[in-house]
Amino acid sequence: MDLVVGRVAKAHGVTGELTVEVRTDDPQGRFVRGAVLRGRPPRGGAEREYVIESVRTHGDRLLVRFDGVADRDAADALRGTVFLVDSADLPPIEDPDEFYDHQLEGLTVITTSGGEVGKVAEVLHTAAGELLAVRTADDTEVLVPFVSAIVLSVSLDDQLITIDPPDGLLELD
């Protein structure tokens, strides 16, 4: 399974540098000089590999320069490109209370009383912590903080996440 670790938001400057939105919990390991990333263009087309020439932090994004991307036109052509890794290449997690995002996405979320909330559509990484974006049966989104006080258990085998939501968390009105 391919996992997205970053996406080109836009060109930065005139020398081929790109603004990349990070979508990995290990940007220091994935976005380093000399690393090779597999890129998929947004409008189809063939995937290709990109070698990182330089990288630096810019707010909550990275400014990345790739070998062979030497000007703004070349950088603009990459807008929307996503960078991928194969989930089979990820190291196993030793801690039973830690998960890769893709392991949580698609799991059914239920309350301690057994009521179904919905399915995890996405895991959001924010400055305040992780949030589970849960898509309900009526196609609304509920954000559930991924903290032990609310998320009581995660069963990958049963494909279930059990939560004990505080009053008001699931109120959608």
UniProtKB/Swiss-Prot annotation:
Species this protein is from: Mycolicibacterium gilvum (strain PYR-GCK) (Mycobacterium gilvum (strain PYR-GCK))
Single GO MF descriptor: ribosome binding
UniProt xrefs under Gene3D superfamilies: PRC-barrel domain (2.30.30.240), RimM (2.40.30.60)
Gene responsible for this protein: rimM
Function, as annotated: An accessory protein needed during the final step in the assembly of 30S ribosomal subunit, possibly for assembly of the head region. Essential for efficient processing of 16S rRNA. May be needed both before and after RbfA during the maturation of 16S rRNA. It has affinity for free ribosomal 30S subunits but not for 70S ribosomes.
Lineage, broadest ranks: Bacteria, Bacillati, Actinomycetota, Actinomycetes, Mycobacteriales
UniProt KW keywords: Chaperone, Cytoplasm, Ribosome biogenesis, rRNA processing
Protein name: Ribosome maturation factor RimM
Top-level taxon of the source organism: Bacteria
Subunit annotation: Binds ribosomal protein uS19.
Entry keyword Cytoplasm: yes
Gene Ontology BP annotations: ribosomal small subunit biogenesis; rRNA processing
Entry's family note: Belongs to the RimM family.
